[in-house]
Amino acid sequence: MGNFLYFSAETWTLLVAFITLLLVYAYWPYGTFKRLGIPGPKPVPFFGTMLAYRKGFFNFDDECRKKYGKTWGIYDGRQPVLCITDPATIKAVLVKECYSLFTNRRNFRLNGPLYDAVSIAEDDQWKRIRSVLSPSFTSGRLKEMFDIMKHHSANLIQSMKKKVDKDEPLEMKEYFGPYSMDVVTSTAFSVDIDSLNNPSDPFVTNIKKMLKFDFLNPLFLAVAFFPFLGPILEKFEFSLFPSSVMDFFFAALRKIKANHENNKQKSRIDFLQLMIDSQKNNQNGLQDKGLSDHEILSQAMIFIFAGYETTSSSLTFLAYNLATNPEVMKKLQKEIDATFPNKAPVQYVPLMEMEYLDCVVNESLRLYPIAARLERVAKATVEVNGLVIPKDMVVMVPTWPLHRDPELWPEPEKFKPERFSKENKDTFDPYTYMPFGAGPRNCIGMRFALVMMKLAVVEILQTYDFSVCKETEVPFEMDVQGFLAPKRPIQLKLTPRSASSS
């Protein structure tokens, strides 16, 4: 203690200067929204408002919407984030000014080998990659893939039957996860891993490791507190994603890509083959058109990641909603029986024309949106509907509170598919319902995910009823870490329709 008191004048000066600079650094960004006249929760040094994420970012967003109205400001570490729920402003950001001012999503860096994935890439690179991928998701292409999907949905039903025969509850994610994985790998790479019958398949175990993301991860916090560290850590190949998982998937995808390139007799065109063809069509020197080897691997990886998690989670929530709303399930089964009498094989066109099925899926996605937050970054300072948005500001649309706003959706907590009927569709603004995002940068796999979901639920309901059991948590508690998911697995029973009908 004595040594501390007898520091030299120069040491004291440096110490005071350091503390002053640290305090300035800690507090400097937190006047942004006050200067703009935008309300919001009070930030704390370095963390900003991130400590509130401990209650779940969706709960935090909901609290802010109720307290501050349609517009508010939060801080992810030192990064100001402008939150908007006004439909006109949302349309301007996501659609009207997408290409000119709000092209890019927020980039946390530390993406490892996924730096050039379509969901992360920016500006011209993103446009080029998106244009190459888009043909993979047309209605015509999905129709070609439908029989492959049906092969795996049949496996799903057969796998579920084993539990039904034992009169045991089913942990829904343990079935919908492998189903999603099998469909994605089959339609994307012509590879059949059959994870439904091989739950310990490394594709499944590794994807689960990747999904264990914590917003209070020390590496994530370091970049949030000190953004200048991002490029430095990236140079040293630090990543928010487990390196062992990335190494596994990229090694596997390299082998699959090599097999595609060496296979002279291509039985079918898949997602990977379309990307490889973009390279071959590009050999005339127009290097700005096709994808590089690394870009191909990154898109394949992000397709596995997004296809597995979003579809399996959405199917799990949908099954829960049907089990807890049996009158909706019975009405849906009537439509299924009318469309495919006597358990007739499900066909693509009539499936996609089922109106009540569409309402049911939309309502489930309203309650549990795939994309709970949509983000864009302003390229320049701009005024949108009277709201000044400074350059480099992150603009965020919180879909969870938007989808559950009682002013927009009467009785928002209730599962009411009729909200999306033809008669009611004109009663709400399309920019108040965005489970897959909106505009040019929406989810590219939206139609693919919807086909997978509709096929699975229709084939299950042709034979079974979803029902709650003693293991079912009603209502279930949401997990507050990472992605939108229940805290504990959702368990339901499947009851043969003949038994339940009688």
From Swiss-Prot:
It comes from Oryzias latipes. The keyword Acetylation does not apply. GO terms for cellular component: endoplasmic reticulum membrane. Its cofactor is heme. Heme binds at C443. Gene3D superfamilies: Cytochrome P450 (1.10.630.10). The keyword Endoplasmic reticulum applies. Keywords: Endoplasmic reticulum, Heme, Iron, Membrane, Metal-binding, Microsome, Monooxygenase, Oxidoreductase. GO terms for molecular function: heme binding; iron ion binding; oxidoreductase activity, acting on paired donors, with incorporation or reduction of molecular oxygen, reduced flavin or flavoprotein as one donor, and incorporation of one atom of oxygen; steroid hydroxylase activity. It catalyses: an organic molecule + reduced [NADPH--hemoprotein reductase] + O2 = an alcohol + oxidized [NADPH--hemoprotein reductase] + H2O + H(+). This is Cytochrome P450 3A40. It is found in: Endoplasmic reticulum membrane; Microsome membrane. InterPro entries: Cyt_P450, Cyt_P450_CS, Cyt_P450_E_CYP3A, Cyt_P450_E_grp-II, Cyt_P450_sf, Cytochrome_P450_3A. Belongs to the cytochrome P450 family. It is a peripheral membrane protein. SUPFAM superfamilies: Cytochrome P450 (SSF48264). Pfam families: p450. Its EC number is 1.14.14.1.
